[in-house]
Protein backbone atom coordinates (compact mmCIF):
# COMPACT_ATOMS: atom_id res chain seq x y z
CA UNK A 1 0.00 0.00 0.00
CA UNK A 2 2.95 2.29 -0.44
CA UNK A 3 1.97 5.08 -2.78
CA UNK A 4 4.36 7.61 -4.23
CA UNK A 5 3.59 11.24 -3.66
CA UNK A 6 4.54 12.68 -7.01
CA UNK A 7 5.09 16.37 -7.39
CA UNK A 8 5.08 17.26 -3.70
CA UNK A 9 6.93 20.48 -2.93
CA UNK A 10 8.97 20.94 0.21
CA UNK A 11 7.23 23.25 2.63
CA UNK A 12 8.93 25.82 4.78
CA UNK A 13 12.05 26.36 2.68
CA UNK A 14 12.28 29.93 1.36
CA UNK A 15 14.60 31.01 -1.43
CA UNK A 16 17.15 33.65 -0.53
CA UNK A 17 15.91 36.95 -1.79
CA UNK A 18 18.35 39.67 -2.79
CA UNK A 19 17.78 42.60 -0.48
CA UNK A 20 18.97 46.09 -1.33
CA UNK A 21 20.46 47.45 1.87
CA UNK A 22 22.75 50.49 2.04
CA UNK A 23 23.46 50.70 5.80
CA UNK A 24 24.00 47.97 8.34
CA UNK A 25 25.88 46.82 11.42
CA UNK A 26 28.80 44.41 11.76
CA UNK A 27 28.86 42.50 15.04
CA UNK A 28 32.29 40.99 15.76
CA UNK A 29 32.39 38.46 18.60
CA UNK A 30 36.02 37.66 19.33
CA UNK A 31 36.59 35.01 21.98
CA UNK A 32 39.79 33.28 23.00
CA UNK A 33 38.88 30.33 20.74
CA UNK A 34 37.09 31.77 17.70
CA UNK A 35 35.92 34.92 15.92
CA UNK A 36 32.36 35.25 14.60
CA UNK A 37 31.39 38.12 12.27
CA UNK A 38 27.67 38.79 11.73
CA UNK A 39 26.47 41.56 9.42
CA UNK A 40 22.91 42.77 9.97
CA UNK A 41 20.63 45.50 8.66
CA UNK A 42 19.64 48.42 10.90
CA UNK A 43 16.72 46.44 12.39
CA UNK A 44 19.04 43.59 13.38
CA UNK A 45 18.05 41.02 10.74
CA UNK A 46 21.05 38.96 9.67
CA UNK A 47 22.30 39.56 6.12
CA UNK A 48 25.43 37.40 6.27
CA UNK A 49 27.74 35.81 8.79
CA UNK A 50 31.00 33.93 8.90
CA UNK A 51 33.40 32.55 11.47
CA UNK A 52 36.92 31.20 11.57
CA UNK A 53 35.55 27.70 12.13
CA UNK A 54 33.28 27.74 9.07
CA UNK A 55 36.23 28.69 6.87
CA UNK A 56 38.08 25.51 7.78
CA UNK A 57 40.34 26.75 10.56
CA UNK A 58 40.50 24.19 13.35
CA UNK A 59 41.88 24.11 16.86
CA UNK A 60 44.27 26.85 17.92
CA UNK A 61 44.36 28.34 14.39
CA UNK A 62 40.75 29.52 14.81
CA UNK A 63 41.85 32.08 17.39
CA UNK A 64 44.47 33.80 15.20
CA UNK A 65 44.08 37.32 13.76
CA UNK A 66 44.48 35.90 10.24
CA UNK A 67 41.47 33.62 10.73
CA UNK A 68 39.45 36.61 11.97
CA UNK A 69 40.52 38.59 8.91
CA UNK A 70 39.36 35.84 6.56
CA UNK A 71 36.03 35.52 8.39
CA UNK A 72 35.40 39.27 8.14
CA UNK A 73 36.27 39.28 4.42
CA UNK A 74 33.89 36.40 3.71
CA UNK A 75 31.02 38.05 5.61
CA UNK A 76 31.69 41.42 3.93
CA UNK A 77 31.67 39.94 0.41
CA UNK A 78 28.37 38.18 1.04
CA UNK A 79 26.85 41.38 2.49
CA UNK A 80 28.07 43.56 -0.39
CA UNK A 81 26.15 41.29 -2.78
CA UNK A 82 23.02 42.62 -1.05
CA UNK A 83 24.11 46.21 -1.75
CA UNK A 84 25.64 47.04 1.63
CA UNK A 85 28.00 50.04 1.64
CA UNK A 86 28.23 51.48 5.17
CA UNK A 87 28.50 49.61 8.47
CA UNK A 88 28.67 50.40 12.15
CA UNK A 89 31.04 47.97 13.88
CA UNK A 90 30.23 46.57 17.32
CA UNK A 91 33.06 44.55 18.88
CA UNK A 92 32.48 42.13 21.74
CA UNK A 93 34.97 39.94 23.59
CA UNK A 94 38.66 39.81 24.53
CA UNK A 95 40.03 37.79 21.59
CA UNK A 96 43.01 38.47 19.37
CA UNK A 97 40.98 38.91 16.16
CA UNK A 98 39.26 42.19 17.02
CA UNK A 99 41.44 44.70 15.16
CA UNK A 100 42.16 42.33 12.27
CA UNK A 101 38.44 41.85 11.60
CA UNK A 102 37.79 45.61 11.58
CA UNK A 103 40.67 46.22 9.17
CA UNK A 104 39.42 43.41 6.91
CA UNK A 105 35.95 44.99 6.73
CA UNK A 106 37.51 48.28 5.63
CA UNK A 107 39.79 46.56 3.12
CA UNK A 108 36.84 44.68 1.61
CA UNK A 109 35.30 48.01 0.58
CA UNK A 110 32.82 48.69 3.37
CA UNK A 111 32.80 52.19 4.85
CA UNK A 112 33.06 52.00 8.65
CA UNK A 113 31.10 54.85 10.23
CA UNK A 114 31.36 53.81 13.89
CA UNK A 115 33.45 51.45 16.01
CA UNK A 116 32.01 50.63 19.43
CA UNK A 117 33.16 48.16 22.10
CA UNK A 118 30.13 46.40 23.58
CA UNK A 119 32.00 43.81 25.68
CA UNK A 120 29.81 42.89 28.65
CA UNK A 121 31.48 43.70 31.97
CA UNK A 122 30.09 41.90 35.05
CA UNK A 123 29.27 43.78 38.23
CA UNK A 124 30.92 40.92 40.14
CA UNK A 125 28.77 38.19 38.60
CA UNK A 126 30.03 34.67 37.91
CA UNK A 127 33.36 33.42 39.19
CA UNK A 128 35.99 33.65 36.41
CA UNK A 129 38.01 30.63 35.22
CA UNK A 130 41.09 29.71 37.22
CA UNK A 131 44.51 31.09 36.25
CA UNK A 132 46.43 29.08 33.65
CA UNK A 133 49.68 27.44 34.71
CA UNK A 134 51.87 26.84 31.66
UniProtKB/Swiss-Prot annotation:
Coiled coil (UniProt feature): none
Gene Ontology MF: a single term: rRNA binding
Entry-linked PROSITE patterns: RIBOSOMAL_S11
SUPFAM superfamilies the UniProt entry points to: Translational machinery components (SSF53137)
GO biological process: translation
Organism: Acetivibrio thermocellus (strain ATCC 27405 / DSM 1237 / JCM 9322 / NBRC 103400 / NCIMB 10682 / NRRL B-4536 / VPI 7372)
Origin superkingdom: Bacteria
Chain residue ranges for the region called Disordered: 1-24
Keywords: Ribonucleoprotein, Ribosomal protein, RNA-binding, rRNA-binding
Keyword Aminoacyl-tRNA synthetase: no
Pfam families attached to this UniProt entry: Ribosomal_S11
Subunit note: Part of the 30S ribosomal subunit. Interacts with proteins S7 and S18. Binds to IF-3.
GO cellular component: ribonucleoprotein complex; ribosome
Keyword Ribosomal protein attached: yes
Protein name (database record): Small ribosomal subunit protein uS11
Function: Located on the platform of the 30S subunit, it bridges several disparate RNA helices of the 16S rRNA. Forms part of the Shine-Dalgarno cleft in the 70S ribosome.
Family of this protein: Belongs to the universal ribosomal protein uS11 family.
Amino acid sequence: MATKMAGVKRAGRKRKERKNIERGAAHIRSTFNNTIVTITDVEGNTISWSSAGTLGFRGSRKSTPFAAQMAAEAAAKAAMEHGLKTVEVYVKGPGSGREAAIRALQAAGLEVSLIKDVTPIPHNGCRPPKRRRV
